Amino acid sequence: MDDNNLPQKDLIKKIVGDARGAVGIRLCAIGVDLGIFEDLAKNGPATSQELADRMNLDERYLREWGLGMFSLGYLDFDKVSRKISLNKEFIPVLVEEGGKFSQKGLIEILNSSLLPYHELLNSFKNGGGINYDKIDKGFWNGIDQTGCTRYRHFLVTDWVDKMPELKSRLETGSVTFADFGCGSGRSTIEMAKKFPKSQFFGFDLFEPNIERAQNIALDAGVKNNLKFMQWDVSNPLTEKFDFVACFDLIHDMIDPLEGMKTIRKAVKDDGIFVLMDIKCEDDPADNEGPMVPFMYAMSLHFCMTTSLANNGAGLGTVGLPEAKVKEYCDLVGFKTVKRIETDHPLNSVFEIRP
């Protein structure tokens, strides 16, 4: 048999391609975290020495990084002037925060989530998982960045529009909206900006997230109809809300069923629960598309493992398909579950009523 036709050749070719992508993300993360892309966008082409002088970074490292990024197709390189430059068409993807095309968050998530590798190997051998305190801060920055893009360009311009009663009541005002697991508050802030007559409350388990959310809200000029509070969703609230939302929360929870019980108690009998989670199939073998490997990798490195680290259910990133949503809703007393058709490639949205 001709060696060029061996099946091993195809696998080797795939591995080489995957390796190129892996190192590409690492080099991109350097450009994002050190602000090199931002400098090139703002100040224009530069030699490695000019860039070093502008940014107070080491020239030799910048030279190697720049050539690597050129070889990957992220930067242009002029062989005569020896200057690297960033195509202006790439600025919305690599530089702009919260833009519709921004991928800064994805880059940071991918790079940082892969760091606790040996702890993950230990979990394979002994069970358990990686706790939240082992997760690199770059991961949280990435989550914030992707949330900024997603909620600014999908939540208030697409998803809410497809729930007319929700939108109408929020516009009329005098209603309350609770965002459970609000993280850095991007979703809550966008809703509060869009519907100034209604009152919004963001709850999150982690105090640093609440502090960050408060600062982002302050910078956005949103304060009169918005409040953030540290709170564990496993502890029931005495207050009830007209609307409750969870965005990418339930599949991460240690005890998702108990969390759903808390949510049901928090929603008024004539209220609506808006659930957004990862778009996935009832049979995980049916999940298809370019982002599916990313979902399983994130599950191993964050979603599933952090739950298992706390003796949780470990649903994982693709652990909340529509059938599981309906199962939980039935168990906790929600009566209707309506899937909202959206254009987002990664998320499903459900309008759920008592």
Task: Give short role names for the model-derived ranges.
Residues 41-47:
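Short capping segments at the starts of secondary-structure elements
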Residues 2, 6, 15-22, 27-31, ...:
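Conserved Class I S-adenosyl-L-methionine-dependent methyltransferase catalytic core
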Residues 276-331:
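C-terminal alpha-helical "lid/dimerization" subdomain adjacent to the S-adenosyl-L-methionine
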Residues 257-269:
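A short glycine-rich, Lys/Arg-flanked "PGG" loop and its adjoining helix->strand segment in the class I
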Residues 332-354:
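Core SAM-dependent methyltransferase catalytic element
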Residues 48-53:
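A short acidic, leucine-rich amphipathic alpha-helix
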Residues 57-68:
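Short amphipathic alpha-helical interaction segments
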